[in-house]
Design a protein with these regions (language model features):
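Short acidic-hydrophobic catalytic motif
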Residues: 1-166
Length: 166
């Protein structure tokens, strides 16, 4: 039986947005079980956007969220860090439209979160159970999900030179 987690105490960092180049202060705050991950634009009177598929914005260069015309961009590294270490509930405050890029990976976010530690909450974690394979294709691109006994992710991408397949 797995339970939801938040962080033990607030943590913050500063950086610049990858695409905007704008300075941004990011602060992550613990929150009650069942809240989920919620982004709060403190520069817009605390406007909130839940990290949910229904708020996913169609932006080709980053994982972005949008609600009522308000955008939060480049969320993928922080969201990956949350999933990777098991943070289910947090408020993410930022004072600009884009999260800081830091070193371009999830690692600085992981280190920042591990530094403050996790707090187990008294609510069981709910998980999506995949019962049959699902594939979505668009041209030569595809994504697939398959039933499994445990969480596992494989990812591949093929760029033109000089990067190639990774």
């Amino acid at each position: 039986m797995k339970f939801e987690n938040t962080i033990r105490m607030p943590v913050e960092c500063r950086g610049v947005g990858l695409h905007s180049g704008a300075p941004v202060k990011l602060r992550i705050v613990p929150v009650a079980a069942g809240t989920g991950i919620v982004f709060r634009r403190v520069d817009l009177e605390g406007f909130t956007i839940e990290a949910s598929i229904r708020n996913l914005a169609k932006v080709s260069y980053a994982t972005s969220l949008m609600k009522q015309g308000v955008l939060i961009s480049t969320t993928e590294h922080l969201l990956s860090a949350f999933v990777g270490i098991g943070v289910d509930n947090a408020i993410v405050e930022l004072d600009n439209l884009e999260l800081p890029i830091l070193d371009g990976s999830a690692q600085p976010f992981v280190e920042m979160l591990l530094r403050v530690g996790l707090k187990q909450q008294r609510r069981r974690r709910t998980c999506l159970r995949i019962l049959q394979p699902v594939e979505v294709r668009e041209g030569d691109k595809f994504i697939a999900i398959y039933p499994a006994d445990s969480y596992s992710v494989e990812y591949g991408i093929n760029f033109p030179r000089p990067i190639g397949r990774s």
